[in-house]
Amino acid sequence: MEKRIATFEDYSIFKADAECINELSRFIVKENYKHHIGSVKSSQIADDIADVTKEELDLYGDNTYIYIVRDHHEKILGSIRVFLWNRQTELPLEKIYGINPLKAIHSDKKFNYWHVGRFAIDSAAGISTFTLFKRLMALAVQPIVGDNNSYMVAEIDSKLLKVMNALGFVTGN
């Protein structure tokens, strides 16, 4: 189910739940291919969509927040997801880079780790990608900035890291 939380001239932002994960996975995989890879076999895309869907369903919990930008025709234009890590489930950060936040940052139980991911924007939508990024990121970091004992963890490329730093986020790698 999706709940509209903001409306703008050309789009609306929705807070969504696990029911949207399959559609969200299709959008994310296709956008990632457009931005980073280019052309690929449709069978590979289908496999990647299935993998992302499974991973997101495995990670989904009570403290998961999914935000989706849709145009007025219900087409997804952007997305971001944040969840409170339970310290047990393997994070994408661990799977991809072998980095465990408990070893890299703090293991003290007073600290919370929020994973931000599944950020994607359709750059061909005709809407400022920077504006969409700022709006989605502001929603995603709400539970993090409200708690001095919270850390945001994410897998990001150098371009996105520069944007995060320009917005005033203190980052480390």
List each model region and its residues.
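Short amphipathic alpha-helix that is part of the acyltransferase structural core
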Residues: 2-55, 61, 66-76
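Intrinsically disordered, low-complexity, positively biased terminal segments
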Residues: 2, 59-63, 83-88, 126-127
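Short regulatory "switch" loops immediately downstream of catalytic or recognition motifs
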Residues: 34-40, 87, 121-124
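Acyl-donor binding region in acyl/amide transferases
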Residues: 93-172
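Short, P/G- and charge-enriched loop/turn segments at secondary-structure junctions
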Residues: 52-57, 101-105
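Short, His- and charge-rich active-site/binding loops that engage polyanionic ligands
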Residues: 73-104
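Residues in well-ordered beta-strands of folded domains
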Residues: 14, 83, 117
